[in-house]
Amino acid sequence: MLKTTLLFFVTALCEIIGCFLPWLWLKRGASMWWLLPAAASLALFVWLLTLHPAASGRVYAAYGGVYVCTALLWLRVVDGVRLTVYDWCGALIALCGMLIIVVGWGRT
């Protein structure tokens, strides 16, 4: 379970970085060269999703819970936005959904 969650976390970071770098280019005038590491990060994201032994749709659904939490962590650390009680509640619900799916995929 810990290995799966850690892999999902790294996967989410790759996806967020792969989307954030083009955002910097488009919104903040960063160099177009940032698109190269963005593409590499997104390619790594896709590859990491293939490392799970469950069916792809089940992996994507479970990954979503960790992605939500990672995005909120990014919101706090990178964007400097204080999380609200709604953010925390949403993260808890998302993680519960992920946990149910991951526990279930080992039993089917």
Swiss-Prot record:
Keywords: Cell inner membrane, Cell membrane, Membrane, Transmembrane, Transmembrane helix
Membrane-related topology note: Multi-pass membrane protein
InterPro entries per the UniProt record, alphabetical: UPF0060 (IPR003844)
Entry keyword NAD: no
Segments on the Periplasmic face: 1-5, 52-60, 106-108
GO terms under cellular component: plasma membrane
Principal subcellular localization: membrane
Transmembrane segments: 6-26, 31-51, 61-81, 85-105
Domain of life, source organism: Bacteria
Keyword Transmembrane helix: yes
Pfam families attached to this UniProt entry: UPF0060
Locations listed in the record: Cell inner membrane
Membrane topology (Cytoplasmic): 27-30, 82-84
UniProt record similarity statement: Belongs to the UPF0060 family.
HAMAP family for the chain: UPF0060
Name the record gives this protein: UPF0060 membrane protein YnfA
Organism, as annotated: Salmonella schwarzengrund (strain CVM19633)
